[in-house]
């Protein structure tokens, strides 16, 4: 019995396990389909419930009956107009929708509605629902593809609210607690059939737990299997049940046969045969089959109408799913086509962009090459322009616009309209004439944002030319408060970025001189002067005395104020100390227009002397850095007392500067340099051979527009002045030697002419050097000398005129002159004469001097090479004929610059004697027979009153006693095209 019970337990356990496995497999396959179908069925039942309640509430509307069990499309079309919803809401809560827009009776269900009707009814319904606190939906849910489940929820909530009101509004209304859904008998059947399934599972679990202790009876096994089968097929369709039962039976039979075969083998091997008894298994299978048949019969006995409806509903849902699937596939195909088109377009765009980039690169390369060429041409043009400016001698004019000071911003308004490379445009209002924009052109224009370094870098080549032997003048001009002192010096608190032109210029000179120290040795010294109330004062005086200093133009070493302190400097620190000392001594005060107004003109003069270590030649250069005091109007500056006197002197000196510029621009014969100490100090720069730069400053404030326009007009007039090409101040050893030889010869001639029988000093003449220099020089005009064979009285030498007014235009007061009498000159020694630059004529004079020496030696050799006394005796008749009789004279060329210089400049005794040594040509002997007993005449000095001087200069050569009738020319002629001016002199 024990063995039989074990076999039964084994078989019963196996049958239950097999049934559970088969049911789990079928449940896993159909779980998804069942879940979807249950959800669809549940939503349909809710929709039917909502439609039934609406049908009960409104009945027939507009001759149309609302369907009791509509589909989603029918449900949406019935509610799309909003009339049904608004009417139901007014019945539940009267007055919720004040106005319902009715539709015509003949409008079909799917026809398009008017926009007003559609939006008015639906909007009013949704507003009222939200005010009542009920679940709402979107207006788009009424369209095709919308979420109808939200419409159903809203209607069911409204139904629950209506039922709550009908019950007397007992307690607070809650939609979740009050909502009762009646899903029909089918739902109740599902709910009832689920209970034995749960109980069967619990029983199966308890049976499994107790299987090891107690044997199971056949009745319990059959009940457990029956419960499992019933619970599984409860929610299945009719067509699925036979398949499930068949699979269960097949599986059970296979398992039973396998178990029986194993059991038979075990029985054969045992000693006691066990009778086969499979009655329990057959009983279980039969019971399950009976239950399945009963369930099928129950399903078949259900009404055919319900089955038909379910079938139609399933087909409709299947068709809807097919439509959705087809639409999705269609959208996928469209997206694929769009993606393909986009990729093709992107490839085309990529190719096009690559082509465009290639062409753009070629174009940019061409532009870059053109820009490089343009910069190169622009730089070359700038160099050529500067070269032309140097050759013409034009005064360079730079303009700088001061930025607005803190607290002076006038709402962004500025008198300056536009600033270009070399043009500045001023906005001119109507009160200054014709309103509009007026441009002014200069060499360079700096805007308010320009730095000190940018300003100096543009004038750096001009500053460096001082080391090459040129004279340079840079002066700042403008009204008071326009930033002149800031440009030239810098602010009160100096930094490396704010250093002015004065500091930067000297630092650059030190740097360049240090670079050239292997070839040239430079000595740099500084003077610092100021012109205060028309008095020249030394700002570097250690004792603090303000003694009056004299200005001497055309001095041999370029120092126009020799009495001022000349301090050698070798570094930037020395310059800063000197500048600080000068700024402390300079006159500065406060006015209504400027807190630190300069009350004087400041001039920093840098003297440079360089010596070439190879040739020994000496270069002289000077640079004037002038900070002019600003012009000011007394009514604006509000000055009185001493400040008023200072302003008057400042305006007077600036007015004199304007007169000088006007005369130079008009190229008049007389330039009034002596009208002011300022113009007298700047005479060498304005009328000489210097490179001059005027830095004009203006203010951007509209209040100073009048002064700005006048300043710019004056600067334009300055830019039109031509001074002539600048010259290098250079002395070489050959010129110095020739000057000494000519001075010794002239002194010997003068002594012999006075009857002093003095043997001349032997003068060594370096013929090789003279011939080499003559070969390098250009041909010059030689004086006409008669031949030895011509002994007639008509053969008279031509000499330069020294007695006329043109020869002594450069004159000063007699109190500052040394005596030029011949007797006093004889008593003095003959030192080496320094070279005096006389407007570019030094080279011509040197060549003429060399030629005169050649003629002089040839004359001595022809007369008597062994008797030098005879040569000096033969010069006595020449002296006699020199002062008596008819003479013709030739004057060398004098340029306009010389005449301008000579009109107002001082002339020292060394300058005059140098002119005598160069211009006077000794004539040849006209009569050798009368040279034995010479009768020298005593020289009678004659004074000539000059037109523009205050002193009388004695003439070295008296005028002839008779005036030629046809050769008198009282007025100097205008210079011809070749620059020559010839005069005939009489008494």
Swiss-Prot record:
Subcellular location: Cytoplasm, Cytoskeleton
Biased composition (Polar residues): 788-797, 964-974
Signal peptide start and end residues: none
Pfam families the record matches: CH, Kinesin
UniProt binding sites for ATP: 478-485
Residues covered by the Calponin-homology (CH) domain: 44-163
CDD domains, per database record: CH_AtKIN14-like (cd21203), KISc_C_terminal (cd01366)
Coiled coil (UniProt feature): 725-754
Tissue-specific expression: Flower specific.
Domain of life of the organism encoding this protein: Eukaryota
Domain Kinesin motor, first and last residues per copy: 394-721
BP GO terms, sorted: microtubule-based movement
One of the record's GO molecular function terms: microtubule binding
UniProt GO cellular component terms: cytoplasm; microtubule
InterPro entries per record: CH_dom, CH_dom_sf, Kinesin-like_fam, Kinesin_motor_CS, Kinesin_motor_dom, Kinesin_motor_dom_sf, P-loop_NTPase
Family: Belongs to the TRAFAC class myosin-kinesin ATPase superfamily. Kinesin family. KIN-14 subfamily.
Name of the protein described by the UniProt record: Kinesin-like protein KIN-14G
Annotated organism of origin: Arabidopsis thaliana (Mouse-ear cress)
Gene: KIN14G
């Amino acid at each position: 019995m024990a063995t039989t019970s074990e076999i039964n337990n084994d078989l019963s356990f196996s049958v239950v396990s097999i049934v559970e496995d088969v049911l789990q497999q079928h449940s896993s396959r159909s779980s998804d389909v069942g879940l979807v179908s249950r959800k669809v069925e549940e939503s349909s039942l809710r929709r039917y419930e909502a439609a039934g309640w609406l049908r009960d509430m409104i009945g027939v509307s507009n001759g149309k009956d609302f369907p009791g069990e509509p589909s989603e499309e029918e449900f949406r079309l019935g509610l799309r107009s909003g009339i049904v919803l608004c009417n139901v809401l007014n019945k539940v809560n009267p007055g919720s929708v004040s106005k319902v827009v009715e539709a015509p009776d003949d409008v079909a269900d799917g026809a398009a509605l008017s926009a007003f009707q559609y939006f008015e009814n639906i909007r009013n319904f949704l507003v009222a629902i939200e005010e009542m606190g009920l679940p709402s939906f979107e207006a788009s849910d009424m369209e095709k593809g919308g979420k109808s489940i939200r419409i159903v929820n809203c209607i069911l909530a409204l139904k629950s609210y209506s039922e709550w009101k009908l019950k007397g509004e007992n307690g607070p209304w809650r939609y979740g607690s009050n909502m009762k859904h009646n899903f029909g008998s089918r739902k109740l059947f599902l709910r009832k059939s689920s209970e034995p399934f749960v109980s069967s599972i619990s029983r199966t679990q308890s049976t499994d737990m107790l299987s090891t202790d107690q044997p199971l009876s056949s009745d319990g096994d059959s009940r457990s299997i029956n419960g499992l089968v019933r619970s599984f097929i409860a929610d299945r369709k009719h067509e699925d049940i036979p398949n499930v039962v068949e699979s269960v039976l097949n599986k059970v039979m296979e398992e039973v046969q396998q178990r029986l075969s194993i059991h038979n083998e075990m029985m054969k091997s045992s000693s006691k045969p066990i009778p086969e008894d499979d009655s329990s298994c057959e009983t279980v299978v039969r019971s399950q089959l009976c239950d399945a048949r009963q369930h099928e019969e129950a399903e078949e006995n259900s009404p055919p109408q319900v089955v038909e409806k379910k079938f139609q509903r399933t087909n409709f849902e299947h068709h809807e799913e097919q439509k959705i699937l087809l639409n999705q596939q269609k959208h996928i195909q469209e997206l694929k086509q769009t993606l393909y088109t986009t990729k093709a377009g992107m490839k085309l765009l990529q190719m096009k962009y690559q082509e465009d980039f290639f062409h753009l690169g070629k174009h940019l390369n061409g532009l870059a090459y053109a820009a490089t060429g343009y910069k190169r041409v622009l730089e070359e043009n700038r160099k050529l322009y500067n070269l032309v400016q140097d050759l013409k001698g034009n005064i360079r004019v730079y303009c700088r616009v001061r930025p607005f000071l803190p607290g002076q911003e006038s709402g962004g308004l500025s008198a300056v309209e536009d600033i270009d490379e070399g043009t500045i445009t001023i906005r001119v209002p109507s009160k200054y004439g014709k309103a509009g924009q007026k441009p002014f052109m200069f060499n360079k224009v700096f805007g308010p944002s320009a730095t000190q370094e940018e300003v100096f870098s543009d004038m750096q080549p001009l500053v460096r030319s001082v080391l090459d032997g040129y004279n340079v003048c840079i002066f700042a001009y403008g009204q008071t408060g326009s930033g002149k002192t800031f440009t030239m010096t810098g602010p009160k608190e100096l930094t490396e970025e704010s250093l002015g032109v004065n500091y930067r210029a000297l630092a650059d000179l030190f740097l360049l001189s240090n670079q050239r120290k292997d070839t040239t040795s430079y000595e740099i010294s500084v003077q610092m002067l100021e012109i205060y109330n028309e008095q020249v004062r030394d700002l570097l005086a250690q004792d603090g005395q303000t003694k009056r200093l004299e200005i001497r133009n055309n001095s041999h070493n370029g120092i126009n104020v020799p009495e001022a302190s000349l301090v050698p400097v070798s570094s930037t620190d020395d310059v800063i100390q000197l500048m600080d000392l000068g700024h402390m001594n300079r006159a500065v005060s406060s006015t209504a227009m400027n807190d630190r107004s300069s009350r004087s003109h400041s001039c920093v003069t840098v003297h440079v002397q360089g010596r070439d270590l190879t040739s020994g030649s000496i270069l002289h250069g000077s640079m004037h850095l002038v900070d002019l005091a600003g012009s000011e109007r007394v009514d604006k500056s509000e000055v009185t007392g001493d400040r008023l006197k200072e302003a008057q002197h400042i305006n007077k000196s600036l007015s004199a500067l304007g007169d000088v510029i006007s005369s130079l621009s008009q190229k008049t014969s007389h330039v009034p340099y002596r009208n002011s100490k300022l113009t007298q100090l700047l005479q060498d720069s304005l009328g000489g051979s210097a490179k001059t730069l005027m830095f004009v400053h203006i203010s951007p404030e509209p209040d100073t527009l009048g002064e700005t326009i006048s300043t710019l007009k004056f600067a334009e007039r300055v830019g039109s002045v031509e001074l002539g090409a600048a010259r290098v101040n250079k002395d070489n050893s050959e010129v110095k030697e020739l000057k000494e030889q000519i001075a010794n010869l002239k002194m010997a001639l003068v002594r012999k002419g006075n009857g002093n029988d003095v043997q001349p000093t032997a003068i060594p003449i370096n013929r090789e050097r003279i011939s080499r220099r003559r070969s390098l020089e250009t041909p010059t005009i030689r004086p006409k000398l008669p031949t030895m064979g011509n002994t007639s009285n008509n053969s008279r030498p031509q000499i330069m005129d020294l007695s006329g007014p043109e020869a002594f235009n450069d004159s000063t007061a007699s109190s500052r002159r040394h005596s030029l009498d011949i007797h006093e000159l004889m008593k003095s020694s003959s030192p080496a004469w320094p070279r005096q630059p006389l407007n570019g004529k030094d080279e011509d004079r040197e060549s003429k001097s060399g030629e005169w020496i050649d003629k002089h030696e040839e004359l001595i050799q022809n007369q008597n090479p062994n008797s030098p006394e005879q040569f000096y005796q033969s010069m006595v008749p020449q002296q006699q004929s020199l002062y008596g009789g008819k003479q013709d004279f030739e004057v060398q060329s004098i340029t306009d610059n010389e005449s301008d210089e000579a009109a107002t400049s001082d002339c020292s005794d060394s300058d005059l004697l140098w002119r005598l040594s160069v211009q006077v040509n000794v004539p040849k002997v006209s009569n050798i027979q009368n040279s034995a007993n010479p009768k020298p005449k005593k020289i009678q000095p004659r004074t000539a009153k000059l037109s523009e001087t205050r002193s009388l200069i004695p003439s070295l050569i008296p005028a002839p006693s008779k005036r030629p009738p046809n050769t008198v020319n009282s007025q100097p002629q205008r210079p011809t095209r070749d620059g020559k001016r010839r005069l005939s002199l009489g008494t």
